[in-house]
């Protein structure tokens, strides 16, 4: 990942660091950072020589990014051009899968969905009132009602396609145990302090 914790989401990730790793290691290196579109993936591989790319925020609300990247690596210019209706079908399916994940608890599922809705609707001319309405949904019926109020024929805005989205805040102060950056190993006590009792717990 070509951005430090201190850099947070500010600026563009430093792909040259990925290239340095590629030149130093004899194992495949996958690069990550600022992959917002298929052309970004091609550029990273070309510039760094990495074996592949890992996708982070770029796929938030844009699950078709993986298909675009697959096509790009295959030498195809084909890209997904979704309508708002296409995106709404993804939103509905996402809500259904979350309901399954939460053992049928629609309220929990729809509350979880809220944080994704802004990503899905980013750039579409739907207005703040629509986003607020989704934030007030309590079950699948509510979600489907709000979807039904949208124009399914609106095209995905070209002006924001493959453009950075989400937080772009700059540097922040990092709090780490004394000597952390000078050591590649951690003690049991340090792992407990950072991750809790179970060092394999990824909930943090």
What positions do the PLM features span?
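Alpha/beta catalytic cores of nucleotide-metabolism and tRNA/nucleoside-modifying enzymes
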Residues: 9, 16, 20-31, 35-204
């Amino acid at each position: 990942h070509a951005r430090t914790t201190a850099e947070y989401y500010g600026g563009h990730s430093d792909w040259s660091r990925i290239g340095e790793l590629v030149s130093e290691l004899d194992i495949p290196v996958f690069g990550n950072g600022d992959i917002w579109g298929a052309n970004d993936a091609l550029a990273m591989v070309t510039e760094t020589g990495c074996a592949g790319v890992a996708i982070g925020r770029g796929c938030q609300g844009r699950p078709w990014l993986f298909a675009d990247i697959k096509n790009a690596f295959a030498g195809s210019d084909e890209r997904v051009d979704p309508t708002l209706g296409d995106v709404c079908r993804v939103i509905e399916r996402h809500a259904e899968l979350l309901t399954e994940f939460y053992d049928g608890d629609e309220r929990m599922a729809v509350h979880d969905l809220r944080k994704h809705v802004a990503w899905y609707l980013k750039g579409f001319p739907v207005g703040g009132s629509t986003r607020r309405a989704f934030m007030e949904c309590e079950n699948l019926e509510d979600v489907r009602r709000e979807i039904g109020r949208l124009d399914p024929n609106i095209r995905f805005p070209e002006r924001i396609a493959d453009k950075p989205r989400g937080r772009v805040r700059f540097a922040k102060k990092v709090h780490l145990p004394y000597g952390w950056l000078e050591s590649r190993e951690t003690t049991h006590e340090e792992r407990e302090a950072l991750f809790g009792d179970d060092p394999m717990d990824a909930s943090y």
